[in-house]
Amino acid sequence: MKTLLLTLVVVTIVCLDLGYTRRCFTTPSVRSERCPPGQEVCYTKTWTDGHGGSRGKRVDLGCAATCPTPKKKDIKTICCSKDNCNTFPKWP
């Protein structure tokens, strides 16, 4: 009985990942970083900057508690909830 109880305790400790936080790519450095507690969503925002796209395409990567809602209709936001799932987009 003691062996069974000890085994269950060890398995519980191994299976629980206490203090785990999500990892997402962030800008401007585009490197993987731990998200603050409570922020479990990775996001990628893309848009064209400047008049008629003269300044090029822009990207914002980061962490959030919920998927950010774009303030402008031309901002595309993609959210995911796995570690480092918000990689820098490939441009056509």
From Swiss-Prot:
Task: Give the source's domain of life in one word.
Answer: Eukaryota
Q: Which residues form a coiled coil?
A: none
| Subcellular location per the Swiss-Prot or TrEMBL entry | Secreted
Q: In which tissues is it expressed?
A: Expressed by the venom gland.
Q: Which PROSITE patterns match?
A: SNAKE_TOXIN
The alphabetized UniProt keywords are: Acetylcholine receptor inhibiting toxin, Disulfide bond, Ion channel impairing toxin, Neurotoxin, Postsynaptic neurotoxin, Secreted, Signal, Toxin
**What is the role of the protein in this entry?**
Binds with high affinity to muscular (alpha-1/CHRNA1) and neuronal (alpha-7/CHRNA7) nicotinic acetylcholine receptor (nAChR) and inhibits acetylcholine from binding to the receptor, thereby impairing neuromuscular and neuronal transmission.
Which protein, by its recorded name, is this?
Long neurotoxin 3FTx-Oxy2
Q: What organism is this sequence from?
A: Oxyuranus microlepidotus (Inland taipan)
